[in-house]
């Protein structure tokens, strides 16, 4: 009898859903746009203060897990629970909850990854370091390539330990988030708006 995901231990989940990196796929952008439309349909545009494609799949030309990360910001604390409950009713699974942060996923099954997999990072307005990191790497392809090399070096070492894989990237990410905030705060935001306009066209 196959266990349900919520019945599995962390080690069992890591075995079923290993770290697996692939070359950049242009269709990741399309996955994001379709899922963004689904989220707006489910939640309504008014509750969503910001929605973004984040993570390595949003950075051109680098290897990434075949999982599209989405950041969704809401304006009120009470909206976090309401949005979470609506998403759970629409095929999303809660991965973790902490202070003013909820992580959900879609595309995880008892048989392994589905064809399309998403991670949703539900946050309060302004909690978006991932945007600084994405934009900085988009503006600095050499740093993006260094990040790719770091991930490739960690892949097999931590293939079945996602927490260790994530922790090993933290110092690199935090360093360039700080760089983006301290040296290029306004330009990073302007770059994002320009890139958003390009995506719409």
What do the predicted segments below correspond to?
Residues 1-52:
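Helical scaffold of the NTase/Pol beta-like nucleotidyltransferase catalytic core
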Residues 78, 85, 95:
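A contiguous binding-surface segment within folded domains or other stable secondary-structure elements
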């Amino acid at each position: 009898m196959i266990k349900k995901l919520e019945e599995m231990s962390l080690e069992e989940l890591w075995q079923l859903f290993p770290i697996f990196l692939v070359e950049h796929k242009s269709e990741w952008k399309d996955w994001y746009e379709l899922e963004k439309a689904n989220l707006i349909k489910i939640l309504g545009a008014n509750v969503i203060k910001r929605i973004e494609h984040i993570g390595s799949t949003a950075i051109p030309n680098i290897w990434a897990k075949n999982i599209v990360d989405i950041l969704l910001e809401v304006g009120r604390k009470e909206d976090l629970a309401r949005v979470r409950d609506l998403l759970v009713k629409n095929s999303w699974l809660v991965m973790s909850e902490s202070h003013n942060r909820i992580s959900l996923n879609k595309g995880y099954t008892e048989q392994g990854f589905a064809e399309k997999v998403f991670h949703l990072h539900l946050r309060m307005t302004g909690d978006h370091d991932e945007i600084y990191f994405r934009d900085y790497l988009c503006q600095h392809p050499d740093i993006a390539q260094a990040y790719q090399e770091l991930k490739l070096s960690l892949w097999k070492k931590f293939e079945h330990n996602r927490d260790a894989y994530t922790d090993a990237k933290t110092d690199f990410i935090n360093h360039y988030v700080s760089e983006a905030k301290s040296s290029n705060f306004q330009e990073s935001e302007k770059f994002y708006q320009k890139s958003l306009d390009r995506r719409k066209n």
